[in-house]
């Protein structure tokens, strides 16, 4: 007994199905096929041979008709019929030889796009109707005018408007173009009398057309219950962006760049491939330099090759071939402004004009528009920056940056000061290099980009790179391991020469808080990483003294006192604070022989400070600076203690003529305010105002920073 294989394609699904009938091929009828499938609501088309046209798809509706056989098997296509709807089918009425298109590829990328993608969307010919799936909704809307019913049972409201209201214009004439624009440009809605799985695209075309192919969209989505919401939202986003006709063409000059710099994402579903999208954009590539193409955009055409009816694999292959050829590349993309993109794209972000992705905005759109978000803020504020401040603060930040009016003729220090300011847009943050944390570092390529876009006078990026190299040679920026050649791939920190200037812009920050927004001198560790111990742990104030031995010295902040405090830590750890001899303390007060009584008081608090501050951070950079720096540190601390005692004799909380660093409310606390801040807190004034007696503290800092690589290992 013979056996017949029947291969059938169901709707637009790309993979065919196979059934076997225990009958010889010449005896198989449509009734036998239907008995196996049990799908009464489908129309059956079979591959057959026509004398005039050759191989065609022939519809067979007679159950007793023999099925055409090729090479011992039957090839069939099943298309959803309109069995659940009262309207008769509009197809195959005029010319039975004109058949629907092959479902092998029409269920692919074309189905996921609205009619605005297709050049024949406005045509009304019979050829367009039968051969183009997307055209069907427009043309059949005009052919079905006599059969439309506007009764109450069909007037379900969509977004406050009944179907009947949408179907006709005041003059009584149908306008399918008005219908499409009014429904597809609204936000997502669902037809209340249809299945919940019907998306916006299918519901709008459903009522504008009674055609068989558009009902196929609806039935297809009913089968995809699991991923229905995700897919319909994706389709509606494509519909929105393309109905606004925001399609741009970008020509990229590949001579200046080594690579295109995009990753692409292919969208596929049961109906086939759904298009090629921009997944991410890499810095340094041609696309990132242009700035107009963004993640989530749909790639429609490359050079003269259209991706519309091409599978994802073919599109990727063509794109690779084009990239390897010399010459410019022209990309045509559809901008996708979906506020909630699919998971394969980057996270949703925002921009002042329209919703896009803020990380992409920072990397390339900011370079084109000139709006920069704030960086280098404390962790508690960084979350605000990533969401709302891109809208609220970008304009003021830009205005503040524009106040500098920087050019290549400006003072180099002024340019570095603007670059170091928090609102400059330069990404300064802690970075990891060989498992070493580099605090407040930035990439060389970011410096070049910042100079090129914010300093006037550069004709090309190469000149901006030369300027960055000069900044390195002049000491305004420093390599983390003291390399003198500039590279865009290396991490850099601000040098000693610009450390002061960076802090001048931070004078409004309160240095007495437990964590500071910016480091005083790079490369100090970020103070917010761990709490710092109090410099004065005792619960009683230092004993008052009738006079201030140093009335002219300003108060000491820890911007330059941090090094000396660290020296005290290490000194105390070596001599184990509690067993310190009196001779050590006499060394400290010998240079000041005139104040023997105050020397004893200072030594006592000095001894207490050294004993209490030994901990995990004892080893500081100044420990390597040698005995000389430690000796200077004693004198620095002596002045610090004397200055602290002056708080109890002067109600103004500071020396005469010098405004206090911190407000009186902070000084009411038991520990002296100058000792409250961590070693990384910003200073109150420039290092140049430090008295000559304390210049050794500044030298100990610079000696410690002479070998930053060891310093970073020490901090970890």
Curated annotation (Swiss-Prot):
InterPro entries to which the protein is assigned, alphabetical: DEP_dom, Dishevelled_C-dom, Dishevelled_fam, Dishevelled_protein_dom, DIX, DIX_dom_sf, Dsh/Dvl-rel, DVL3
Subunit structure: Interacts (via the PDZ domain) with the C-terminal regions of VANGL1 and VANGL2. Interacts (via the region containing both the PDZ and DEP domains) with LRRFIP2; the DIX domain may inhibit this interaction. Interacts with CYLD. Interacts with CEP164 and DAB2. Interacts with DCDC2. Interacts with FOXK1 and FOXK2. Interacts with DAAM2.
High-level lineage: Eukaryota, Metazoa, Chordata, Craniata, Vertebrata
Residues where Dimethylated arginine is found: 698
Composition skew (Pro residues), residue ranges: 653-663, 670-682
Region annotation Disordered: where it falls in the sequence: 85-235, 546-691
Residues annotated as domain DIX: 1-82
PTM entry text: Ubiquitinated. Deubiquitinated by CYLD, which acts on 'Lys-63'-linked ubiquitin chains. Phosphorylated by CSNK1D.
Gene Ontology terms describing biological process: canonical Wnt signaling pathway; cochlea morphogenesis; heart morphogenesis; intracellular signal transduction; midbrain dopaminergic neuron differentiation; non-canonical Wnt signaling pathway; outflow tract septum morphogenesis; Wnt signaling pathway, planar cell polarity pathway
Stated family: Belongs to the DSH family.
One family name in Pfam for this protein: PDZ
Protein name: Segment polarity protein dishevelled homolog DVL-3
Residue stretches of biased makeup (Low complexity): 175-190, 199-212, 565-581
Residue ranges annotated for the DEP domain, each copy included: 422-496
Listed Basic and acidic residues bias regions: 142-156, 582-595, 604-622
Annotated ranges, domain PDZ: 249-321
Primary location class: cytoplasm
CDD domains, per database record: DEP_dishevelled (cd04438), PDZ_Dishevelled-like (cd06717)
Source species of the chain: Mus musculus (Mouse)
Annotated signal sequence range: none
Keywords: Cytoplasm, Developmental protein, Methylation, Phosphoprotein, Ubl conjugation, Wnt signaling pathway
């Amino acid at each position: 007994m013979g056996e017949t294989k029947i291969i059938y394609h169901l709707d637009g699904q790309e993979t065919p199905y196979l059934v076997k009938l225990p009958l010889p091929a010449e005896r198989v009828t449509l009734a036998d096929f239907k008995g196996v499938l049990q799908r009464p609501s489908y129309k059956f088309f079979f591959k057959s041979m026509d004398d005039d046209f050759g191989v065609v798809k022939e519809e067979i509706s007679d159950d007793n008709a023999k099925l055409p056989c090729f090479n011992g098997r039957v090839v069939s296509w099943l298309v959803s019929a309109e069995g659940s709807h009262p309207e008769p089918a509009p197809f195959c009425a005029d010319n039975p030889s004109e058949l629907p298109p092959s479902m092998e590829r029409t269920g692919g990328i074309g189905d996921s796009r609205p009619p605005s993608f297709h050049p024949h969307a406005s045509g009304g010919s019979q050829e367009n109707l039968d051969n183009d799936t997307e055209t069907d909704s427009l043309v059949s809307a005009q052919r079905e005018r006599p059969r439309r019913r506007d009764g109450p049972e069909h007037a379900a409201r969509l977004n406050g408007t009944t179907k009947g209201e949408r179907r006709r214009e005041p003059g009584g004439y149908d306008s399918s173009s008005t219908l499409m624009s009014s429904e597809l440009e609204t936000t997502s809605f669902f037809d209340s009398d249809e299945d919940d799985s019907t998306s916006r695209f299918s519901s709008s075309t459903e009522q504008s057309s009674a055609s068989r192919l558009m009902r196929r969209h609806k039935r297809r989505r009913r089968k995809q219950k699991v991923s229905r919401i995700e897919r319909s939202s994706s389709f509606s986003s494509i519909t929105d962006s393309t109905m606004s006709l925001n399609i741009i063409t970008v020509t990229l000059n590949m001579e200046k760049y080594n690579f295109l710099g995009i990753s692409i994402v292919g969208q596929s579903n049961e109906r086939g491939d759904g298009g090629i999208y921009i997944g991410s954009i890499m810095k340094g590539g041609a696309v990132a330099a242009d700035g107009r193409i963004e993640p989530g955009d749909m790639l429609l055409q490359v050079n003269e090759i259209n991706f519309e009816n091409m599978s994802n694999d073919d599109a990727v292959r063509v794109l690779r071939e084009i990239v390897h050829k010399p010459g410019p590349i022209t990309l045509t993309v559809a901008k996708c402004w979906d506020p909630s993109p699919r998971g394969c794209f980057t996270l949703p972000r925002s921009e002042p004009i329209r919703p896009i992705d803020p990380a992409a905005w920072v990397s390339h759109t900011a370079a084109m528009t000139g709006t920069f978000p704030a960086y280098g803020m404390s962790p508690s504020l960084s979350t605000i920056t990533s969401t709302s401040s891109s809208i609220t603060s970008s304009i003021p930040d830009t205005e503040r940056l524009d106040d500098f009016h920087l050019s290549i003729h400006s003072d180099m220090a002024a340019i570095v000061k603007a670059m170091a300011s928090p609102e400059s847009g330069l990404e300064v943050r802690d970075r990891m290099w060989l498992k070493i944390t580099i605090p407040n570092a930035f990439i060389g390529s970011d410096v070049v980009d910042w100079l090129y876009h914010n300093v006037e006078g550069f004709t090309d990026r190469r000149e901006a790179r030369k300027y960055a190299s000069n900044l390195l040679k002049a000491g305004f920026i420093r390599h983390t391991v003291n390399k003198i050649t500039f590279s865009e791939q290396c991490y850099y920190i601000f040098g000693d020469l610009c450390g002061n200037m960076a802090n001048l812009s931070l004078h409004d920050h309160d240095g007495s808080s437990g964590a500071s927004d910016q480091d005083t001198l790079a490369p100090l560790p970020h103070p917010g990483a761990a709490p710092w111990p109090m410099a004065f742990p005792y619960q009683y104030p230092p004993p008052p003294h009738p006079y201030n031995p140093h009335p002219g010295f300003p108060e000491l902040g820890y911007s330059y006192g941090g090094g000396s405090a660290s020296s005290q830590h290490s000194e105390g750890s070596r001599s184990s604070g509690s067993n310190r001899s009196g001779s050590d303390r006499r060394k400290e007060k010998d240079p000041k022989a005139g104040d023997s009584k105050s020397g004893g008081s200072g030594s006592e608090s000095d001894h207490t400070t050294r004993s209490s501050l030994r901990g995990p951070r004892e080893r500081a950079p100044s420990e390597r600076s040698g005995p000389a720096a430690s000796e200077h540190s004693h004198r620095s601390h002596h002045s610090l203690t004397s200055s602290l005692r002056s708080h109890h004799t002067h109600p103004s909380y500071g020396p005469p003529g010098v405004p206090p660093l911190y407000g009186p409310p902070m000084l009411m606390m038991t520990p002296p305010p100058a000792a409250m801040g961590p070693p990384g807190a910003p200073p109150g004034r420039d290092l140049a105002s430090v008295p000559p007696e304390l210049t050794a503290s500044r030298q100990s800092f610079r000696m410690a920073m002479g070998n930053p690589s060891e310093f970073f290992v020490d901090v970890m």
